[in-house]
Swiss-Prot record:
Annotated organism of origin: Dictyostelium discoideum (Social amoeba)
A Gene Ontology term for the protein's cellular component: membrane
Membrane topology summary: Multi-pass membrane protein
Family under the similarity heading: Belongs to the LIMR family.
Transmembrane annotation, as ranges: 4-24, 42-62, 75-95, 120-140, 215-235, 335-355, 378-398, 427-447, 476-496
InterPro entries cross-referenced by the UniProt entry: LMBR1-like_membr_prot
Compartment annotation: Membrane
Record-given protein name: LIMR family protein DDB_G0293610
Keyword terms of this UniProt record: Membrane, Transmembrane, Transmembrane helix
Superkingdom of the source species: Eukaryota
Length: 507
């Protein structure tokens, strides 16, 4: 029977997320995008709603309790993740390419054609890689314990701590494979096991059950695989960078300055702007037909980073003089929020150490105990805490992506989210990133809260099929260590070089 309350929750939560997404666009969008770019805005709203829904489906799966709530969760998970894949690989890139088309050519057909070309390139690369890997490695190998025989000894109880038992019955010797009439049944022997209930089993635990997974499940695996790569890099960086920047921004907050100081700093910013204009013209002159060399693309990414830092410095200068330092209470709120974020990040890292790395026999359940206790006290408390912890990981991914592009390798242009100054291409890029990593974050949370999610459909999907695929299964062994290691390396790097500085552009 379908649980009416769960249906209401399943409808209301996505609706609230969609409304929140609409407010997010209104709050962050650039003035140039007001009353225009409706198609990208619709994609952003749907993408954020889809990502949030996929993460919040985990507590719904728990509440459903293996089908007692009436939802076919195994089917719903497959459907939601296929839709996530379509949005992340096709729809978001298409909307982004369409938005970024050259304004000099106003023909809608030209914009659509350009968007189709870019999207097709991404889709073709993903499809080709998926098909090749599916043909060779689309087989799951599930370790199994094969019970060759099982019998009961009558009137002779066996305790797990008992001494070896000797029997002279030829029948029993034949069952367990003995060559003589006498055989010892040892409860401590991994092949001849007594379970403390008068039963003895002869086991062979080196067998693997092999089966080819469906193409839909393998597509989900590929999305999860790439999501994990991004989550390891950006999530690991963001776990440290998010609280670090919130706290250090308070230290470097705009201070009230006199007029002469304002003019001096404004002059320096103007000189930097003039230099960047010349650099931009040089980069543009070396670009033919929209095609950039690897070196020019790196310079272009460095150029965008320098522009961003210049705009940040100018905004701080305006706040320091024209607004006399701004609203101090907001900086204090961010400062205390940074310590809250620090506590959450430390909580996640500690949970990784004492529960996830030490599995299957963890030192302590830690966050599992918190979520389960709150869930037992009142179901929504556990869901709220789970939602906050999982969405915090999404924020860390977005922050880590921005920090990565700003400070490290400049492999792709930065797409910062700034209040009242965020273009739609930045929205679309970050939504695509959130969609891809939402799959890996759900997988991560399934393992992190395994005591909370042990009977769920998503746990069976990830732990049975996805985690046991050929070749790829070795990747799942190291990713938890990789996230922790990335966070430690980021902490060391940020303490050595805490300030963002413009990169040197070699044109």
């Amino acid at each position: 029977m379908v649980n009416i309350f769960l249906i209401i929750v399943a409808v209301v939560i996505p609706a609230l997320v969609a409304l929140g997404s609409l407010y997010l666009i209104a709050y962050f969008q650039h003035p140039d995008d007001k009353n225009v770019a409706y198609f990208p805005k619709i994609i952003v709203i749907l993408g954020i709603t889809l990502a949030a829904t996929s993460i919040l489906m985990l507590p719904l799966d728990v509440a459903n309790q293996g089908g007692k709530g009436g939802f076919p969760m195994d089917i719903l998970w497959i459907v939601i993740y296929i839709v996530v894949a379509v949005f992340a690989i096709v729809i978001c890139p298409f909307a982004m390419f369409f938005y970024e088309s050259e304004e000099a050519d106003p023909a809608a057909g030209s914009q659509i054609a350009g968007a189709f070309k870019g999207t097709f390139a991404i889709l073709f690369a993903f499809a080709a890689l998926t098909i090749v890997l599916y043909v060779f490695f689309g087989v799951a190998e599930i370790p199994t314990i094969v019970i060759l025989s099982r019998f009961q000894i009558i009137n002779y109880p066996i305790a797990t701590d008992s001494i070896n038992i000797t029997t002279t019955l030829p029948e029993i010797a034949s069952i367990v494979g003995g060559g003589n009439d006498k055989i010892k049944l040892d409860p401590g022997n991994p092949e001849l096991l007594g379970n403390g209930s008068e039963y003895v089993e002869y086991r062979l635990d080196k067998e693997f059950l092999q089966f080819r997974v469906s193409i839909a499940l393998f597509i989900i695996t590929m999305v999860a695989f790439f999501g994990w790569l991004l989550f390891i890099i950006f999530g690991g960086i963001g776990l440290v960078a998010l609280p670090f920047d919130m706290i250090t921004d308070f230290k470097n907050r705009p201070q009230r300055i006199p007029y002469d100081k304002y003019l001096e700093r404004k002059k320096k910013i103007g000189e930097r702007a003039t230099e960047l204009v010349d650099v931009g013209k040089t980069i543009q002159s070396r670009t033919t037909g929209g095609i950039m060399s690897k070196r020019d693309r790196r310079n272009y990414n460095r150029f965008r980073q320098a522009i961003f830092l210049l705009e940040e410095d100018y905004e701080r200068l305006k706040i320091s003089y024209k607004r006399q330092g701004g609203k101090v209470i907001l900086y204090y709120a961010q400062f205390f929020g940074g310590f809250i974020a620090l506590g959450v990040s430390l909580g996640w890292l500690l949970h990784i150490i004492i529960y996830m790395i030490t599995a299957p026999e963890p030192f302590h359940p830690f966050l599992n105990s918190l979520v389960i206790s709150l869930n037992n006290a009142w179901g929504f408390l556990g869901v709220i805490v789970y939602g906050l912890l999982s969405f915090y990981l999404l924020f860390c991914v977005v922050k880590g992506n921005f920090k990565f592009g700003l400070r490290l390798f400049f492999l792709f242009p930065i797409h910062p989210m700034r209040v009242g100054n965020t273009m739609m291409n930045a929205f679309l890029f970050n939504v695509g990133l959130i969609l891809i990593t939402s799959v890996s974050i759900t997988h991560f949370c399934t393992m992190a809260f395994s005591q909370f999610t042990s009977t769920t459909s998503i746990n069976s999907l990830f732990e049975t099929a996805v985690k046991n695929l050929k070749i790829l299964k070795w990747f799942w062994v190291v990713y938890i260590f990789a996230i922790f290691a990335m966070s430690i390396l980021t902490a060391i790097f940020l303490f050595i070089k805490p300030k963002d500085k413009p990169a040197r552009i070699r044109v």
